[in-house]
């Protein structure tokens, strides 16, 4: 089966093409914060010849605590993302949480993302599909890889074939996630070899059972990312922060921004090697 392609301007997502980085920050902490982070990503990806889509959220709507920082909201957040596009000339992606957010987000963003916790919400799927935008579908932690076929089918029935599928880990008992490397191949087969993205950042989450925020295993991000790239991916989803200890959300899982270039250099080497090998099917 030939790998399906999804095009975004000059960028091509495909499981047999050089990987695309969906990289950025967890949440829009301020306009300058977003511009500065995007500048680092753009410079590093330009030097390494890695296609880039910049990611940031305008609203973290599923925080554990009502007191946690959520972001600037839809209107101000989309204005910030537009400024990133205008300043750095790079495409952007954000996540939407209600059907009403889909159309305005798609007017600014090149890709809109369906959050993992909401992947079975049919009204939201219909609204997102109706924009005609490229959609990044996060696999819920509670779904098996093969069940992603049902989410993909909803989008197709709603007339949208511009789909990316994204692995972000699976529940492993209480308060922990694991990444099943066998699941990558299952998702590819069940979803007709749609471009597969690996969200290495959120796969590193683990919770304090009594806490109100997610913990993480940032020190293991390179191990997990290299393992995922070895499977043959269309893209990597990554969040970084200039000072993870001060991040407003998910700092324990964020890559320190100053380590972005050596981190991506290693992943590019793995990706280049894997995709230089001849195809081999084992029955």
From Swiss-Prot:
EC number: 2.5.1.55
Keywords: Cytoplasm, Lipopolysaccharide biosynthesis, Transferase
Record pathway: Carbohydrate biosynthesis; 3-deoxy-D-manno-octulosonate biosynthesis; 3-deoxy-D-manno-octulosonate from D-ribulose 5-phosphate: step 2/3; Bacterial outer membrane biogenesis; lipopolysaccharide biosynthesis
Sequence intervals crossing the membrane: none
Catalytic activity: D-arabinose 5-phosphate + phosphoenolpyruvate + H2O = 3-deoxy-alpha-D-manno-2-octulosonate-8-phosphate + phosphate
Localization terms from the record: Cytoplasm
Gene Ontology MF term list: 3-deoxy-8-phosphooctulonate synthase activity
GO cellular component: cytoplasm
Superkingdom assignment: Bacteria
One Gene Ontology biological process: keto-3-deoxy-D-manno-octulosonic acid biosynthetic process
Pfam families according to UniProt: DAHP_synth_1 (PF00793)
PANTHER family the record matches: PHOSPHO-2-DEHYDRO-3-DEOXYHEPTONATE ALDOLASE
Annotated family: Belongs to the KdsA family.
NCBIfam families: KDO8P_synth, PRK05198.1, PRK12457.1
Name of the protein in its database record: 2-dehydro-3-deoxyphosphooctonate aldolase
